[in-house]
Amino acid sequence: ARAVYVTPSHQYPLGARMPVTRRALLLDWARRTDSLVLEDDYDGEFRYDVSPLPALRSMPGAADHVVYIGTASKLIAPSLRVAWIAAPRRLRERLRVELESRGLVVNEATGLALAEFIASGSLATHHARVTRTYAARRAALVAAASDHLPFVVLDGVEAGLHVVLRLPDDVDDLDVVTRLEQVGVAVSPLSAYAVATPVRGLVLCYAGLPETQADAAVRALAGAIGPDALT
């Protein structure tokens, strides 16, 4: 069987969410061709000002064709090293053997602690709290960009923990990144993710950016990009 890997909740780096209609088409293809869809719920925990979209795994007819992959790395901490898989029944034993043979299993104490954290409602409380925090940081970044970079476009603002700032084609994002590094601002160039023709832009993570620092950070961005590129 063939397989396709997707991140429908929040594609990295552009931040797009896969529409329900396209999810349904993908499932129909998987059923018709007896293929698998590997659904990585990357950044699926965080969304802002938009309604949730159904996981592919939860849609009708998905149980035999979708392998759902989730992780606690964004919601709790990457150091916890906990992830989970919801797979078709016919694959579960094979997956268990493969994971155990490679040592890719969670120790019992960590698993039990996380199970209790979920069952007690503490995870839901934590999720709500950190979502409010990230929403405020996102709003501060977007507002600062509107003030200081009014001619650029921000993509991927609906979900996740980063946005993409599109740059004009004649602005080299690698040069902008270098200038930002000199003033202590770390961002990633969008062109580094391109397979063919580079798209100019910056990948901006706001998870660790307090609201009080967003304006200064975006002013540094504007200075590194240069006024000629923004008019």
Describe the residue ranges of each PLM region.
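PLP-dependent aminotransferase-like
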Residues: A1-V20
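Short glycine-rich anion-binding loops that position phosphate/pyrophosphate groups of nucleotides
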Residues: P8-Y12, K74, L209
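Active-site pre-lysine segment of PLP-dependent enzymes
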Residues: A16-L36, D43-L75
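A generic "structured core" feature
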Residues: V37, V97, L114, A144, ...
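Conserved core segment of the aminotransferase class I/II
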Residues: A62, Y68-R132
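Conserved PLP-binding active-site segment of the aspartate aminotransferase-like
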Residues: A87, V164-D170, A186-G226
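Conserved glycine-rich beta-strand-loop-beta hairpin in the small C-terminal domain of fold type I
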Residues: A115, T133-V142, V152-R166, D173-R179
